[in-house]
A protein has these predicted regions:
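Active-site mouth loops of central-metabolism enzymes
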Residues: 12-37, 42-44, 125-154, 179-182, ...
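Glycine-rich, aromatic-flanked loop segments that form ligand/cofactor-binding clefts
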Residues: 91-133
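Structured C-terminal cap/extension of enzyme domains
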Residues: 1-58, 347-407
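Catalytic alpha/beta core domains of metabolic enzymes, predominantly
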Residues: 237-384
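Hydrophobic faces of well-ordered beta-strands that scaffold small-molecule active sites
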Residues: 124-130, 166-170, 200-206, 227-234, ...
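Acidic (Asp/Glu)-rich catalytic clusters
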Residues: 160-164, 192-197, 218-225, 245-254, ...
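Short, acidic/polar
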Residues: 148-160, 216-217, 353-360
Length: 407
């Protein structure tokens, strides 16, 4: 076979393929010398011309926004199923006591100062500490009370008339077996003198010894019958020693309120409350969940108080009690009073600031009653409470106004 024939054989399939794809063949510069030209097309798929694609115009770029989109905002407000019980401290003559006024704490139905949900029914209050025996106090405090430190009644009167105490706390430290081991009768006599000196409600503080406190509280409850004093405090240690029942019965029989103290443990707080329910109605119980000072565990105190209040609002009946803070514990922090470097000065203000910050932190966690010491700290905390309470109920859509608020 010649080269020309071989080339023709190789070309034939290519021609057929082009004819199948394009439907036509255009030959240029080709000379064909034939007698007869025969083309055979084998049966197959019909020849279809490729579709023509229409030209697509390029999309115009999106326009830049000229204003912020408007959207409706519905502020979230919440109703809580629980409510903190109200507790009345002190009793007027019409109620069997001799106080010139009473103090009501508790009653919250929303978290502390959620004014856009509901304003607190009663403002938090401040009690000033008084001691029945000489105790070591920082100079910053002694400056204000030096003349009355040996007279609890005069000290209480100064706290009310000069420093604006809503309540007076009388700490009966002289009853401590390791200090003076004063008798319950002598302690009760001190309480009588304080009740005659002032007309505000009274908190009676023990020495911390369960056995001695139990005997003192029973005697004080009898002597101060009808005055609705707050006995501070009853503990699970008393229960374990078999002393709690006697104190609770004395409080019930003589018309007083008890302070249930536990150390940063809600389960133990609930257990103590359950034991007290056997003798006392809920409106005769206040809780002390422990106050740790700024720099010494304040964040733990804040958390436990906040958890207790939210549990109460969400319906836990065993935590629906007003809460007391022993804010004077701030002075246990050595930074509040000891001599330090110049960056810590002025020393006379450091302690009051320490006590104030401790109180304000727990105020926002829901504390209803503060035990305090320094007059400047007391005044500052009362002013803050007054400002917050004066706002009343606010509209939910204005909850961010604090960003531009001026004090």
């Amino acid at each position: 076979m010649g080269k020309e024939e071989e080339a023709a054989i190789k070309l034939s399939p290519k021609l057929l393929e082009l004819l199948r794809k394009l439907g036509e063949i255009e030959l240029r510069d080709v000379d064909i010398e034939v007698g007869d030209l025969e083309i055979w097309l084998q049966p197959g798929a019909p020849l279809v011309a490729s579709p023509k694609v229409a030209a697509v115009a390029a999309a115009a770029p999106p326009k830049k926004p000229t204003k912020i989109l408007e959207a409706e905002f519905t502020p979230l407000t919440q109703k809580y199923p629980g409510r903190v019980v109200e507790v009345t401290l002190g009793a007027t003559k019409g109620k069997g006591g001799s106080r010139g006024k009473t103090v009501v704490i508790g009653g919250a139905t929303s978290p502390a100062f959620y004014l856009f949900e509901e304003a607190p029914p009663h403002p938090p209050v401040v009690a000033l500490d008084v001691f029945d025996t000489e105790v070591p106090l920082p100079k910053a405090i002694k400056t204000y009370i030096q003349e009355v430190m040996e007279d609890p009644a005069a000290w209480a009167k100064l706290a009310v008339e000069k420093f604006g105490a809503d309540i007076v706390t009388v700490h009966l430290l002289s009853t401590d077996p390791l200090i003076q081991d004063a008798s319950p009768a002598k302690a009760a006599k001190t309480i009588e003198e304080v009740l005659q000196a002032v007309d505000v409600p009274i908190i009676v503080g023990g020495c911390g010894d369960p056995k001695k406190d139990a005997s003192v509280f029973k005697k004080v409850a009898e002597v101060a019958e009808g005055e609705r004093v707050l006995l501070s405090s009853v503990t699970l240690d008393m229960a374990e020693a078999g002393l709690l029942d006697g104190v609770a019965k004395a409080a019930k029989d003589h018309g007083h309120v008890v302070l249930a103290f536990t150390a940063l443990d809600l389960n133990r707080a609930k257990e103590l409350n359950r034991r007290l329910y056997e003798f006392l109605p809920k409106d005769r119980i206040v809780m002390d969940l422990t106050t740790a000072a700024l720099g010494y565990g304040l964040e733990y105190s804040f958390t436990i108080h906040e958890r207790a209040r939210m549990a109460a609002l969400m319906g836990d009946p065993e935590l629906q009690h007003p809460v007391l803070s022993g804010t004077t514990n701030a002075w246990a922090a050595r930074e509040a009073w000891m001599k330090m470097g110049p960056e810590w000065e002025p020393r006379e203000l450091r302690g009051p600031v320490w006590e104030t910050v401790t109180a304000l932190a727990l105020l926002l966690a829901g504390v209803d009653l503060f035990m305090m010491m320094h007059p400047v700290a007391v005044r500052t905390v009362k002013e803050v409470i007054g400002q917050l309470m004066s706002k009343g109920g606010t509209k939910p859509e204005k909850i961010a106004d604090w960003v531009t608020a001026k004090m």
